[in-house]
Amino acid sequence: MSKIDKASRRQKIKDRSRFSVAGTQEKPRLCVYRSLSQIYAQLIDDSGKKTIMAVSSMSKENKELKGSKTEVCHRVGKQIAEKALANGITNVVFDRNGFRYHGRIKALADGAREAGLIF
């Protein structure tokens, strides 16, 4: 599968799932983006069109993280969950953004669930 096919496949899945995945103020959307070496997670309120909070593997508290990419993703998932719980958010809608639920995406989701987020 060529790189163009992978990108267009992910975009189609992302567009298709956007109809069923929407966040509100009470239950925001946990949107995940995975680049080649980094991971980004955001809590988004789609009704107000605002990002509530964001954590990435490049943020200041994560600069010194050691370990594999999967372990770093697990820690990022725990951090976004801890921030959400501190703001009173317990339920979220998980948006994998067209990526397969496998590897680093799954590690982030598992970390968020372990820290107490419900989805």
Curated annotation (Swiss-Prot):
Keyword set, alphabetical order: Ribonucleoprotein, Ribosomal protein, RNA-binding, rRNA-binding
Q: Where is the signal peptide?
A: none
- Ribosomal protein recorded as keyword: yes
Q: Per the UniProt record, which residue ranges are transmembrane?
A: none
Role description? This is one of the proteins that bind and probably mediate the attachment of the 5S RNA into the large ribosomal subunit, where it forms part of the central protuberance.
Report quaternary structure and partners. Answer: Part of the 50S ribosomal subunit; part of the 5S rRNA/L5/L18/L25 subcomplex. Contacts the 5S and 23S rRNAs.
**What's the protein here called?**
Large ribosomal subunit protein uL18
- Tell me the organism: Chlorobium luteolum (strain DSM 273 / BCRC 81028 / 2530)
Please name the gene that encodes this protein.
rplR
